[in-house]
Amino acid sequence: MKKVIALVLALVMVFALCACGNSAPASSDSSAKKEALTFTTGGEAGTYYAFGSVLAQYVSNNTDLSVTAITGNGSKANVEDLDAGDVQLGFCQSDVMSYAYDGTNLFAETGAVGSFSVAAALYKEQVQIVTMNPDIKTVADLKGKIVSIGAQGSGVYFNAIDVLGAYGMTEADITPVYQSFGDSAESLKDKKIDAAFIVAGAPTTAIVDLSTSAQVYLVSIDDEHMDTLLASSPYYSAYTIAADVYGTPEDVQTVAVAAVVLVRDDVSDDDVYTFVSTIFDNIDAISEQHGKGAELSLEFASSMTSVPYHPGAAKYYEEQGLTIPDYLK
């Protein structure tokens, strides 16, 4: 009898060990599928964070790729975080992206950054000159005024300098302050500043929130100075912000740069392919969650020419019938 009991116990132990052995690989396979990427965006009051969060959540909910959106400190800082390996994806203005890759302008002192490539260009972000003073009608009217021009060394800062320069003005012609979008909006509301440069996709959360409590005005760039500005930089394009976006008295003419998602070169081709394809195969669904989704297009996504595309992104675009030149692969 004792032998029978011992035999039964031995068999139970064998079955238990087999069950444990069989379950381990299944768990391992499951965890291996869920790759994790961190996506640095922008401040909470800007479009980068709002839209980036939508994209990250959509990809995470519909694929085996986990993407987490975090707040960021602007294009230059996002490039630096990518280069340091602290994040794998990051929003960046197209002009700042080129400065980083070439080691010019904002990156002249630190040198070229070669650790990133393009995942997709998503939409145009406008240089918005915001004021609550109806007497400020042109850029020239900013002379002698207190103006927020973004953090020193940021993309916004250089955009502001470019616009002022088109009018023959410099930073010395204004009283500059260096604030984020959200802080600029608060300062405008409290009448601590006269105007602010905000470079983000319209409608921008900070400006929308401001417009709910008071009348806001956007300063237009006239045709003559628009031509000067466009001739000075290949990264700008003319753009009109319709009056109904913020409830301004009239449409406003300004310039725009592209909002681009950059990715570290060492992220796998499969992960980048999944990220890009999930976004552009589901534009309608994403548009229901954020207005910028309606601006997504494959043609614009694959239109960058100054920085190479990640192989995973290039593969997807070419499968859709688009051509990525060899020098951009």
What do these predicted regions represent?
Residues 87-123, 204:
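Acidic, polar ligand-binding/catalytic clefts
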Residues 34-61, 66, 124-190, 303, ...:
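Bilobed "Venus flytrap"/periplasmic-binding protein-like clamshell domains
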Residues 34, 64, 74-77, 84, ...:
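Extracytoplasmic
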Residues 53, 76-88, 162, 182-194, ...:
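Short helices/loops that flank or line small-molecule/ion binding pockets
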Residues 183, 190, 200-213, 218, ...:
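An extracytoplasmic/periplasmic, membrane-proximal ligand-sensing/linker region
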Residues 1-37:
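Short, low-complexity disordered leader/linker segments with a strong preference
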Residues 146-162, 234-306:
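Ligand-binding clefts/hinges and TM-proximal coupling segments of bilobed small-molecule sensing domains
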Residues 94-96, 103-107, 171-262, 266-267:
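Pocket-lining segment of extracytoplasmic ligand-binding domains
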